[in-house]
A protein has these predicted regions:
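Feature captures the catalytic ectodomains and active-site-proximal regions of enzymes
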Residues: 1-192
Length: 192
């Protein structure tokens, strides 16, 4: 269950975003609701997730700073770390660059959610724009990384905006691993 809202939309926006699935499930299409446009807040009410086996809990128990930026800050427990909830890709990446500058060591996890939102909205133009913003942000991040740092860029699922529906898609997703001075190799298709 996801509880979300913002002040950049109206009740009409919410009514117009209502969807009925299989004739019995009623919900709000979040991207259509305009809730993300201003003062967005979100809570993911997960069930049965043991925070003691999640990376932030394990890492902070061992003294490793943990910073979660973007949607991941809403859905992963980080009791002893720093969690910054935000949606705009440019803001998420600026916060990531800031975190890298401020911390000599640690685990920083940033979630770019706007590609997911553009996919659900079936907006390929917006999807492309978000990829370009992310590419620029990663380009600003790379010079800040040392030979001790590892950057992993990945996706948890596809969301093809041109597939003809607003659901997650199952195509292969990127897995890019970068370390300064490391020769590039093809890691092949990985199993999930």
């Amino acid at each position: 269950v996801i509880v979300f809202g913002g002040s950049g939309n109206t009740m009409d926006d919410l009514y117009n975003a209502q969807e009925v699935k299989q004739g019995k499930f009623i919900g709000i299409a979040s991207a259509k609701s305009k809730s993300y446009e201003k003062n967005y807040h979100c809570r993911h009410l997960g069930y049965g997730v043991n925070k003691n086996v999640q990376a932030p809990t394990i890492l902070t128990k061992h003294g490793i700073p943990c910073i979660l930026i973007g949607k991941v800050a809403d859905i992963v427990a980080n009791d002893k770390g720093e969690s910054i909830s935000c949606v705009p890709t440019e803001e998420c990446l600026k916060l990531t660059v800031k975190a890298v500058r401020e911390h000599d060591t640690g685990f920083i996890c940033t979630n770019v959610q706007e590609t997911d939102l553009a996919g659900h909205a079936q907006d390929s133009t917006r999807y492309k724009e978000i990829l370009e913003i992310a590419d620029k942000g990663i380009g600003e991040l790379l010079p800040l990384l040392s030979e001790d740092d590892i950057l992993i860029v990945q996706a948890d699922h596809g969301n093809d905006p041109d597939i003809g529906n607003s659901k997650h898609t199952r195509e292969c997703v990127p897995l890019l691993i970068y370390r300064k001075g490391l020769k590039g190799v093809n890691v092949g298709v990985r199993k999930t």
